[in-house]
């Protein structure tokens, strides 16, 4: 995709990805979503429930329950990923969070049960509570080297079999439990 996407566009993408604006399953079969050439903008209709699009943000619950998605390429100009944005995308196995993203909301990737590795960009400074809760295949997390402290919500990797955590040399975690991580690098 290339160009601007508003709430109406996101609604159609949801339907093509297996879930409509009311949370009901659709026959959509879109599995790979490349948003690298996209600017998300205000406007259009609501995309899910009463949620509407905002500039440079994958808003709250944007792709919630879009179970057909397996891979998403996030725009490089994105600043924020909202609460539950990819929640219950059970088949999502690949996502790279670009460097410009500053905030990742609570439960943003809740129950992305096929997600095995996540890479988090260097400008992220806040990650909400339970952001990766119940990502039951998540074995590796990479925090790209950044210059700022990182505020991490409690139980970031709750119910995840995380084995390796790669941490850039300038990162400082606040309110973070390392749980059962086997390798810290």
Residue ranges and their predicted role:
Residues 12, 45-46, 132:
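Short, solvent-exposed loop/turn and secondary-structure capping segments
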Residues 13-26, 61-64, 176:
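Leucine-rich repeat
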């Amino acid at each position: 995709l290339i160009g601007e996407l508003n709430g109406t566009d996101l609604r159609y993408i949801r339907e093509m990805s297996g879930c409509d604006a009311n949370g009901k399953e659709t026959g959509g079969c879109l599995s790979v979503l490349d948003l690298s050439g996209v600017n998300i903008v205000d406007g259009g209709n609501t995309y899910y429930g009463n949620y509407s699009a905002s500039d440079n943000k994958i808003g709250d619950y944007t792709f919630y329950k879009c179970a057909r998605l397996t891979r998403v390429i996030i725009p490089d100009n994105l600043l924020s990923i909202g609460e539950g944005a990819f929640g219950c995308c059970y088949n999502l196995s690949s996502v790279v969070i670009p460097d410009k993203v500053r905030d990742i909301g609570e439960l943003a990737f809740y129950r992305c049960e096929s997600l095995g590795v996540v890479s988090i960009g260097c400008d992220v400074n806040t990650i909400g509570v339970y952001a990766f809760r119940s990502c039951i295949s998540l074995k590796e997390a990479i925090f790209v080297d950044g210059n700022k402290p990182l505020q991490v919500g409690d139980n970031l990797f709750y119910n995840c079999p995380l084995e390796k955590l790669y941490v850039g040399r300038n990162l400082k975690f606040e309110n973070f439990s390392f749980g059962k991580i086997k390798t810290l690098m």
